[in-house]
Amino acid sequence: MTISILPGIAAIAEAYDGFVLDLWGVIHDGHNPYPDAVDCLTRLHGAGLGKDPGQGHSASKRIVMLSNAPRRSHGVIAAMVTMGIDRALYDHVVTSGELTWQALKARSDPWHAALGRRCLHIGPERDHGLFEGLDLTLVGKPEEAEFIVNTGPWRDEEQLEDYMPLLQAAATHRLPMICANPDLEVIRGGVRIICAGTLAAYYASLGAPVRYHGKPYGEAYEACLAAMGLSDRARIVAIGDSLITDIKGAANAGIATLLVTSGIHADELGLAYGDHPNPARLEQACARHAIMPQAAVAAFRW
């Protein structure tokens, strides 16, 4: 399969009514928006405004941000405002943290209902907002806990090896773990750091039970589609930088995919920000991961 490499988002803007946009690696780098991102988002938001939809198509673009941030949606919105990303430029934000919070609040399925109330949080203090309003008691040791919420390493410089003793101890107690960020790693300000998904994968390898919320799992995309209010999946595209979360998840949900190549796979592809990808090298990388997007673009630019 040949992957089309597009000059920018304008090339597909008219083909779709709904856009599911990844944040980290597409819109921003964890600290600042990418050079072209705000301009592109502004143009995309305005691309359908005031037009006659015709044939059942939407008169304005539906834009939903889908992030594996282990924080609630309102916190991610506030962070984007701080970065200078106007709240008026998109419709909704769905985060893995919000999905986690909703699942723990509702406890409407047997797995979550059985978790208990004593929780060991693996993750930095900045993620504590995830527990507000949940009637949980946070504890500090596996032997005190009934389950684990994993939002990632306590410090960016830490590696999996730093957590192996803790995770091994938790596994002996068969503590269920919720992974509130399935990403394995992320690049923050040019530095590659591990995410909660790396810790969860190791914990699962010990035979311990793990439940994931976020991409690439189906509930994340169903939440986006519900927020959009669009029924025709052929008119929806997901734009992301990770083959194993963004592209895989969207493909499984039956929506089109566009890979941004200057994100998490940039080193693998030998690219700096905005570099045009080599088609053969891109297809080789996709083959290694056994995931093929319909198209690719160097950066989220118009």
Task: Give a label for each model feature.
Residues 47-59:
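Intrinsically disordered, low-complexity terminal tails and inter-domain linkers enriched
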